[in-house]
């Protein structure tokens, strides 16, 4: 049976620029950074303490996915506090956090315009 999600792949335009964003601004750790082919590297990151990896890789022929909404939601215990911290690091949000019956959330963008949800668990 399926045990979990090994990694999600985020399409990026410039792997070095994206690697800096995800490690320096979001605090992800590098798990693997090695050549994949003559054009790209296989870069796998992980949120400290998490099981699921994040791969910064765009399969050839899928460049149109760069900058799209990724339907990925990252969670935190305190959306407002995390929002404030990420804004201070230069992360761009579409709007401040909002609160609904199910919790708080805010949408942020990476350096390629990919959009992600930051939400409470």
Per-region residue spans from a language model:
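Vicinal oxygen chelate
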Residues: 1, 10, 31-34, 41, ...
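Core segments of cupin and vicinal oxygen chelate
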Residues: 9-52
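Short, charged/polar surface micro-motifs in flexible loops or helix N-caps
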Residues: 48-53, 61-63, 79-81
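Eukaryotic phosphotyrosine signaling hubs
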Residues: 5-7, 69-72
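Short amphipathic alpha-helices within nucleic acid-binding modules
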Residues: 21, 80-85
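Helix N-cap motif at beta-to-alpha junctions
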Residues: 15, 77-80
């Amino acid at each position: 049976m399926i045990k979990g999600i090994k990694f999600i792949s985020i399409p990026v335009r410039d792997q070095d620029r994206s690697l800096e964003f995800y490690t320096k601004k979001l605090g992800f750790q590098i798990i693997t950074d090695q050549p994949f082919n003559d054009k790209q590297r296989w870069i796998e990151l992980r949120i400290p303490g998490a099981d699921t990896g994040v791969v910064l890789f765009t399969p050839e022929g899928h460049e149109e996915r760069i900058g799209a909404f990724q339907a990925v939601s990252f969670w935190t215990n305190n959306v407002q506090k995390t929002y404030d911290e990420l804004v201070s690091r230069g992360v761009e949000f579409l709007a401040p956090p909002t609160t609904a019956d199910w919790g708080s959330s805010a949408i942020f963008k990476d350096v390629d315009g990919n959009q992600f949800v930051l939400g409470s668990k």
